[in-house]
Amino acid sequence: IFFFFFDHGSPLYDFQTLCHYVDTDLAIIDKEKPDVIVGDFRLSLSVSARLRSIPYISICDAYWSQERALKPPLPVMGFTRYAPIALSQFLFRRIAPFAFRLHAQPLEKLRAKFGLPSLGYDLRRCYTDADLRLFANFPALFPEVNTHVGADFIGPIAWSPEFTGDLSFLAGEGPLTYITMGSSGNPKVIEKLVPILESLGSRIVITTAGKPLSFIPKLPTTRIFDYLPGSAVCQKASLVICNGGSPTTNQALCCGVPVLGIAQNMDQLLNMEAIANYGAGIVIRADRLARATLRQAIESLVTDRKYTNRAQHLARNQGLESRPSTLSGHILDQYTKRKFTS
């Protein structure tokens, strides 16, 4: 349901849902009595935590930061497959402020219900409001975001589940491409990618998140799994192809691997825009998947070392040396502030 609303441009949560979330939040808060609350896109927590006067830390993405100007890219919608992108983008930029205000309305209504001040119907603030916002991104991707007492970079979160299976197949000869479109991606995209990669001599590892594929690979060097530990695969890969979302791009870039992001929604497009601007990847809109376009992008990423060099530079220089090295440092800081100011 979440991805349906996100991809179709509808508000992610309605007022009644957010009210229910606040009730659930408060029940847990009153039972557990936390000193600090840490949330990840749980929009109701910006209300619930304030109602109990508990410091709230939000883990979020810097491309939604109010410290940078938001130039909203046109997401993929039904009509964009047929409309000229330049014209559609021009028109979208002009109606986006009204659309964002509509998206912000449920949370603004929630805040008004509980006597909290308005966030100015600023969607960036509605998505990230907290006492401390921690950006789970590489600082180098967002040089225009200046950190301060209420906002800092915690660095990319590249989590993978523990895996006890055999990964020896990753050690074969030749370049390896890792394809994963995630739970929100369209598996039909994979069917377009595999023949191109096979023709270029790449070994291929595909994870489908349990979604069925309607084709059978021609070569034994193409292997398909429901799930694999992404970070482990990225360590052996020379290219990662995904939906452009930050969970997978963080895994790839932490391993110094360039990314081809086939992006659909605004979140993915904003993330990949920063990566492409840095030179560590290429973004293709999911409504512009011509075979020639895909092949050109893949060949560029595989043959032009500049993309790999930029990805490796990013992995080596995360720019976090002067900041608290762990989330616990930020939590302790918020706890201390509460302890001595309450």
Please place each PLM-identified region on the residue numbering.
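Active-site-proximal region of nucleotide-activated glycan assembly enzymes
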Residues: 57-143
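Donor-nucleotide binding loops and adjacent catalytic segments primarily
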Residues: 140-239
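Structural motif
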Residues: 35-36, 132, 176, 239
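Phosphate/nucleotide-donor binding subsite
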Residues: 1-35, 89-90, 105-107, 222
